[in-house]
C-alpha cells in the first residue's frame, strides 16, 4: 500500500521531516517514490515551517494513497494557509 508519511532527517535533537510518498513496506527513512514537501517543527523567525505541493498530494490521494494522522493534519494546515 502506498502511504504519504514523514521521513525524519536533521540532526540529533533538531528534527526535520520530509513528507514523502512511499510503499508502506519500506523503512521510515528508506526508499520513497516522491518527495512532496517538508515540515520543520523547530522553525524560528522567518524560516518556513511547512511547504507542501498540494497538487501532487491530491494526485496521490486520488490514486489510493493513504495518509498518516500527522500528515493529514499538516495537509489541512497547508490548505488553510493557502486559502
Swiss-Prot record:
GO terms for molecular function: structural constituent of ribosome. SUPFAM superfamilies: Ribosomal protein S16. This is Small ribosomal subunit protein bS16. Keywords: Ribonucleoprotein, Ribosomal protein. It comes from the Bacteria. GO terms for cellular component: cytoplasm; small ribosomal subunit. GO terms for biological process: translation. It comes from Shewanella sp. (strain W3-18-1). Coiled coil: none annotated. Belongs to the bacterial ribosomal protein bS16 family.
Amino acid at each position: 500500500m502506498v502511504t504519504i508519511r514523514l521521513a525524519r532527517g536533521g540532526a540529533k535533537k533538531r528534527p526535520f521531516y520530509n513528507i514523502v510518498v512511499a510503499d508502506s513496506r519500506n523503512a521510515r527513512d528508506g526508499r520513497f517514490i516522491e518527495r512532496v514537501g517538508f515540515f520543520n517543527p523547530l522553525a524560528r523567525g522567518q524560516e518556513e515551517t511547512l511547504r507542501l505541493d498540494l497538487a501532487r498530494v491530491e494526485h496521490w490521494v486520488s490514486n489510493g494513497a493513504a495518509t498518516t494522522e500527522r500528515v493529514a493534519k499538516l495537509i489541512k494546515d497547508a490548505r488553510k494557509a493557502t486559502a
